[in-house]
């Protein structure tokens, strides 16, 4: 049989149990303290170990720093992009508002009669509005941020009125009211005629009616008073530029042409112009080393290439195309000039050589002839009367790889003396027409010497020779088809002696006129004055009568 018993714990306190609990608590506390110390030591050991690892891994540290810097740069670029996007949005809103203002201004014209004047006024107001758009936009943004705006939304007309009012207020055209909002909540109406600082026309100095002004160059004008200083015609706003002053843009361009040399606008209004070719150029190009053609006297434009001859003379491309380069090439021209003198009944009987030479050879021959050139005239030809040795150009140069003339052939040639005329020397490399004029001039010197006209006054002798050169140039203007009729009507410039080289180019025709102009406008006391005096005598009489008069007045070898 089972027995069930009940057990009840004793509630009596045992002192030995208290001591055991205290010891247990002490042991537990010591254990916890040791755990804390152990964890601290482990944490310090871990930190030291991490520091040691970092010190042995500088590349990892550098990469971390580089990533941080890249993150900063990326954030900066993102900020700049957001700022530019906001600015583009503001610019687009400004353009839309400007279009609204312009359309609104065009619809508010007073009448069709003053439509043109109103359009000009609207353009001025639109410009004024555009100048103040940014300020108005910024002011509106500040007001919105401060949450102090109590003005209800405005319709399109009210917005336009506000913009114009703000702009006029900023320019001092209306008074600054303490409260820009009237009782009805709208902005006060703008009267642009109130306290207007520019109500007087700068042209006629009289008052300007509302809507009839043009604002330019910082002042106001009547439309009819704002005229071009070149053509005196009114200037429309689309024909005007502040940088060019009170003139049409087209008139300014015509009055301020580009330099023929550097193709730039002239500084100010100072420039030089060739008296014949009418080519305008900057004054400093005369001294800055710009090449000048020794034949036509034109300066070399940038982008072109002049040719330098062996004696350092420059020749332009057009003159080079028709230049006579050696003695052999000049012989047909020599025969042509002799025929020209024969047609004037002034045949040159004596045969003597014609030689093309370089500049130095010509100077040397001039010195041996004891010719005293005191008049600053460039010598391009000479009639010799003494025997000497001359370096003649017998082989024309060829064009080198860099555009220079090379392989010029010269040879010494003995000129035999004992005669009134021993030879004629002319610079090589000049155009055929200029060479022909010089040859005609020197041939007249030869004719005078061979016919006993010696010891003439220099002004008279050079004047006669210039007249013959001028006459030959005039003969070159005749066409071969008109030769017969011209020869019968004029004894001075027979067309039968027109150029035998064939049809002249347009440039050669112009070069003939240039050479004639050089003779006619020469201001030297010997060549220029002498030509004009003799030419006047020949015009009043004839060349033969003048020569006979000189022969009658004086005996050969006398001083006239």
Swiss-Prot record:
<dbReference type="Pfam" id="PF00412">
    <property type="entry name" value="LIM"/>
</dbReference>
<keyword id="KW-0677">Repeat</keyword>
<keyword id="KW-0440">LIM domain</keyword>
<dbReference type="GO" id="GO:0043130">
    <property type="term" value="F:ubiquitin binding"/>
</dbReference>
<feature type="domain" description="UIM 1">
    <location>
        <begin position="43"/>
        <end position="62"/>
    </location>
</feature>
<keyword id="KW-0862">Zinc</keyword>
<protein>
    <recommendedName>
        <fullName>Protein DA1-related 7</fullName>
    </recommendedName>
</protein>
<keyword id="KW-0479">Metal-binding</keyword>
<comment type="function">
    <text>Ubiquitin receptor that probably regulates developmental process.</text>
</comment>
<feature type="domain" description="LIM zinc-binding">
    <location>
        <begin position="199"/>
        <end position="269"/>
    </location>
</feature>
<comment type="subunit">
    <text>Interacts with ubiquitin.</text>
</comment>
<dbReference type="GO" id="GO:0046872">
    <property type="term" value="F:metal ion binding"/>
</dbReference>
<feature type="domain" description="UIM 2">
    <location>
        <begin position="92"/>
        <end position="111"/>
    </location>
</feature>
<dbReference type="Pfam" id="PF12315">
    <property type="entry name" value="DA1-like"/>
</dbReference>
<dbReference type="InterPro" id="IPR001781">
    <property type="entry name" value="Znf_LIM"/>
</dbReference>
<dbReference type="InterPro" id="IPR022087">
    <property type="entry name" value="DA1-like_dom"/>
</dbReference>
<feature type="domain" description="UIM 3">
    <location>
        <begin position="155"/>
        <end position="174"/>
    </location>
</feature>
<dbReference type="InterPro" id="IPR045218">
    <property type="entry name" value="DA1-like"/>
</dbReference>
<dbReference type="Pfam" id="PF23625">
    <property type="entry name" value="UIM_2"/>
</dbReference>
